Amino acid sequence: MSSSVTSKYVLNSFSSVPRLSYAKSIDIKDSLTDLIKIQRDSYNAFIGIDQDVDSGIKNIFQSMFPIQDLLGRAVLQFVSYSIGEPQYDEYECIKRGITYSVPIRIVLRFIVWKVQEVSFKEVKYVVDEETSEKSIKYIKEQEVSIGDLPTMTSYGTFIINGVERVIVSQMHRSPGVFFDSDKGKTYSSGKLIYLARIIPYRGSWLDFEFDIKDILYFRIDRKRKLPVSLLLRALGLSNSEILDTFYDKIRYERCENGWVVPFVVDRFRGVRLSYDLVDIDGNVLVKANTRITLRLAKKLASDGLKKYLVPFAEIQGLFIANDLVDPASNVMIMCAGESITSEHINKLKLFDINEIFILNIDFLTVGPYILNTLFLDKNISYEDALFEIYKVLRSGESPSLDTMKAFFDGLFFEKERYDLSTVGRIKLNDHLGLDISEDVTVLTKDDIIHVIKKLVLLRDGEGFVDDIDHLGNRRVRSVGEFIENQFRIGILRLERMIMDYMSSVNFDNAMPCDFVNPKVLATVLKDFFSSSQLSQFMDQTNPLSEVTHKRRLSALGPGGLTRERAGFEVRDVHPTHYGRICPIETPEGQNIGLISSLAIYARINKHGFIESPYRKVDNGIVTDKVEYLLAMQESNYYIADASATLDENNRFVDDMLYCRHDGNFVMVKREQVDYIDVSPKQIVSVAASLIPFLENNDANRALMGSNMQRQAVPLLKADAPLVGTGMESIVAAGSGTVVLAKRSGIVHRVDGLYIVIRAFDKEKNEYLGVDIYNLRKFQRSNHNTCINQKPLVKPGDYVRENDVIADGSAIDQGELALGKNVLVAFMSWQGYNFEDSIVISSEVVKKDVFTSIHIEEFECVVRDTALGPEKIMRSIPDVNEDSLSHLDDVGIVNVGAEVSAGDILVGKVTPRPPVSLPPETKLLVTIFGEKVFDCVDSSLYLPIDVEGTVVDVHVFVRRGVEENDRSLLIKQNEINGFIKERDYEIDVVSEYFYDELKRVLVNTNTEYNNQNIEDYLKSIPQKSWWDIKLSDESVLSQISDLKEKFDSMIENAHSKFDQKIDKLNYGYDLPQGVLCIVKVFVAVKHNLQPGDKMAGRHGNKGVISRIVPVEDMPYLEDGTPVDIILNSLGVPSRMNVGQILETHLGWASVNLGKKIGNILDNIDELTIAHLRNFLDQVYDGQDLKYSIRSMSDDDLLAFAERLRDGVPMAAPVFEGPKDNQISNLLKLADLDVSGQVDLYDGRIGEKFDRKVTVGYIYMLKLHHLVDDKIHARSVGPYGLVTQQPLGGKSHFGGQRFGEMECWALQAYGAAYTLQEMLTVKSDDIVGRVKIYESIIKGDSNFECGIPESFNVMVKELRSLCLDVALKQDKDFLHDRKINN
């Protein structure tokens, strides 16, 4: 089958070059365009974008209202709700450090009824005579604000207090009923104990379980267990009703020779009777003690056996089905459920009972479990049962019957306290075969009875327990559901407050707004977004880490598992994960298997279950119809693998195929196949799908590869991989890092900060308006990496909706570019690549190949103190002028200044209390009138390990406080930006409308003022064109319409500008006591250096051991030195062969590019044909081949020019090129098919003994930078109690000389060194001072004293009342204080 190009080639300067791909499957691109759909859809369902559809918010309001006061005198009703617009845009919220939120307002109606009389217990209402309804005293309706709701950004994140956060989706056990067993672990006998659990969405859990004696118990909320008969009686069932419910009855009729019983085939399967089987005519059919098989039983039935005889004595030991009472004397003969004894048989004869009903309990297929449980507490009444349940859950209270009944009903049968949710009801119905409406989200009596029945059947050996790790039993809770739950909690609190307020307020003066406190809801939402385990600081290292974080699934969090309790089963890969959850991408630590990632094509349905897409197969022919299946549905079908071979009619070539069915692989005929996978890569996540040749790697290394891609730092110049997978452009577009065109149109203007597009409809007929895109320049991400967007388009380009028009960080031509393509050699070099170490060429460092920019934020807060306000100023006490050279007149560092450790970023002084001056100083002050310094330096200094360039400064001045010059300058720059935007918009609008006006006027072909109208228009200003009056009414009407639209758009541009200015002039709300906040952003350049961690995409990670001069690096025959040397021993044991195949394919890619470059360098008419022919060979079997043949010469040259650096390849997951295809490409590039070349030693110029594998590999620089880790201390802070140096880089601490290090010195016998380490170099306070003195004096002698830690230990022992003292010269040295 021919391979295809990953994207149709469009000759745009801003589109990426299509990749040479060997994929056979068809991608469903629609599913891939929106990678954060899971977040967006969930949130939209909660807020209700479409108010007609029931949303989460609307349902909550409707369930809470109406609220009436305790006596029913007034009622508060919900009318409608509305969601406002955010006050500030996303960037402004990050900048100001505030939450990106929208106001929620509800319309409430307050009705007060007319009342005649109000007593303690009831209210008498005035009734309207006409309607017979309660009379209304008055109605008040008002719109009320109930608080702000954090809203989702366009990228699927939330901005909380200026920080971007992500709400991670949670996998949890679905509401419903689950049947399980203890797997024989509870009792030493290994007997299986079966249990059932009904889990609601909200409310009490109900468990049923057997014990070792096969008595059935129940528990509520894991409290003490009680016999299940108590629960059944509390549901209102009597003993006989319980038996009727759980057991079948068999009718026994008396005759002369015994009891006549109906013959039922199923009851005789494998039975051995102790008596002869005799029909009612007395014929012996089967002798006693003969085993009756199912086949024999069926033969007897077919021979006409309807009834048979049971001897009188043989009913002994059976159980009577209902109470037996003598009709004549009303004497109770037997109670329901009693076992029949010989005495009972005699009574049956005595009282002449001709008909009895027996419970169908045979101890084989039907056990007496319910019956035995019933006889534990046979005589307990309905009231006693309620009391027993109440006593377990609310011990120590003595309730009334009504209280107990209300309490029991509230546990499972009232919507306010118990909610199964729609999902729970569907699962219950499905599991138990019920047909109860989905609207009934509480338990019913039928539910409980059917659960007990199914559990008893399990104990009897029928059916199977549930697999709790099956994705049909686990659902995903996404962001909308979490916020809905928090919203409900907030609204319930609000409801209680409203009811409290209603009991004390005067209704005559009350308005709806008086009842609502907006802070209640805001507090609950703030707590969730700030502190919930699932509200996480967004991983913003690079675009991939953003996407992956939003698509993450966690089993941890509230209502989920904990790391400590989670076993192997829940962490393991399950067959139902196929196409739903990635089996590769998961953390390596203690969270392994608990945190996973959604597969590429998977989606989450409205009930929270994960669906995977499949193409429908009809009678062996694969159709283009794509259907999404749930895990539960999938087990019923035969599903073929995407790699199955199809002919040109999409029919399976093979007669028999391997298919997945019910968790197993089976071989079936092609006509039996129901579905086929849409793509081989549908089983993996976004990160894993970016690894080329994934199928050639060990799964452990693939896991590391997908995790380390998320740690890659965006580099100074992005470089898309030569060997990709075809997913790079999709991830880039879905990440939110690039700028996508909102609407189709023509690019009007481009600069470093703005892209202005004149938008049209799809047919380019109707003008829609102006789209202005603000590019993000040198902004700081959550992980201090640099966000910088660069335009790809140029004026005049036509762009379509969702085209990439600007690259972001780690994006190259709209493709994800996390690392660099470098020339690699797999060999050892002087032992410097021992144990995965990496050797790098100095040329790589010199050319800034792996240089990255990191932006650090520093904040200076100016407060109002008790002694007066702090001040930002340039004149700082005791600081010389040279140290202030990079500050402006205000005292704030200039943008563009180069700063290093210890430099002042913001000069600030703080008032200090006046000190008591000595008399001579007072005299000088009196004589000269000089004011002594009454302030102290509290400036913001650059920390010790930072050096870089100031790229931005933000100054926030409290509203009402006078702004400084720097603040005014920054504000003016912002206003200039707004003016620029407004003018751009007006320019585009004017250009379009004046063109349209000119077209209308010129098309009239008339003269105006005795000259041609086109010439006349040139002679007057454009503004005057509107004043031209023509005689044609239709033309005047057209001009009038154009003028109206023109004025409207210009007015709109001005109003948007005015709004922005108003927001800017509004000022900043800062915390209490804060006058001003200055934020300084410093860009730090990190060059590659030894100690930095690097990795490929195949889990091949290592640390740079040495940067070797370029002239010493091994080089190729043409003199090209290699960039990087990797250890070839790192491949076989790790089994990540993908890196070698990538190297070969990269080698072919670059050399094909060089070959194309050589042809281009000598281009003429003959060589153009040669070029076309060569490209035809390169793209052989590709769709692009036909485009190349039909391209014009100019287009062909432009296309070939972009292939100079290498022909981009795609090796999609499970569809990478095979070894013969790689060999063909190497041959085409005139290379050895082994992929190995002769290398020469750069130091001595000799050829190495054997050929070396050389090629191009894509390497990433990870965010484990040596600059952030290496640390040294000479002098620094000490701990207060122990007086030992602090530990850790963040505290500028020292290295701990620990227990084992002391042993090492002991082993060497270095006694004096050891003594120094434990005393003067650590916590001997006196000794430290003395050694400092002796160093100053030049003396080399010192004495060691007692370490402070020893004194601490002595004090602690004394606190335990143990008197510890030092012994010296046979005397005890007590602490003087103690002796005194």
Swiss-Prot record:
InterPro entries registered for this protein in UniProt: DNA-dir_RNA_pol_bsu_ext_1_sf, DNA-dir_RNA_pol_bsu_external_1, DNA-dir_RNA_pol_su2, DNA-dir_RNAP_su2_dom, DNA-dir_RNAP_su2_hyb_sf, RNA_pol_bsu_bac, RNA_pol_bsu_CS, RNA_pol_bsu_protrusion
CDD domains associated with the record: RNA_pol_B_RPB2
Pfam families named in the record = RNA_pol_Rpb2_1, RNA_pol_Rpb2_2, RNA_pol_Rpb2_3, RNA_pol_Rpb2_45, RNA_pol_Rpb2_6, RNA_pol_Rpb2_7
Transmembrane helix found in the keyword field: no
Q: Which reaction does it catalyse?
A: RNA(n) + a ribonucleoside 5'-triphosphate = RNA(n+1) + diphosphate
The record's SUPFAM superfamilies line, in alphabetical order, gives: beta and beta-prime subunits of DNA dependent RNA-polymerase
Query: GO terms for biological process?
Result: DNA-templated transcription
Specify the domain of life of the species encoding this protein.
Bacteria
The UniProt record lists the EC number as 2.7.7.6
Is Magnesium found in the keyword set? no
Q: Which residues form the signal peptide?
A: none
EC class (word): transferase
Q: Name one GO cellular component term.
A: DNA-directed RNA polymerase complex
Q: Which UniProt keywords apply?
A: DNA-directed RNA polymerase, Nucleotidyltransferase, Transcription, Transferase
UniProt GO MF annotations: DNA binding; DNA-directed RNA polymerase activity; ribonucleoside binding
What is the annotated role of this protein in its UniProt record? DNA-dependent RNA polymerase catalyzes the transcription of DNA into RNA using the four ribonucleoside triphosphates as substrates.
Share what the entry says about its subunit structure, partners included. The RNAP catalytic core consists of 2 alpha, 1 beta, 1 beta' and 1 omega subunit. When a sigma factor is associated with the core the holoenzyme is formed, which can initiate transcription.
Describe the family membership recorded for this protein in Swiss-Prot or TrEMBL. Belongs to the RNA polymerase beta chain family.
- Protein name per its UniProtKB record: DNA-directed RNA polymerase subunit beta
Q: Which organism is it from?
A: Ehrlichia ruminantium (strain Gardel)
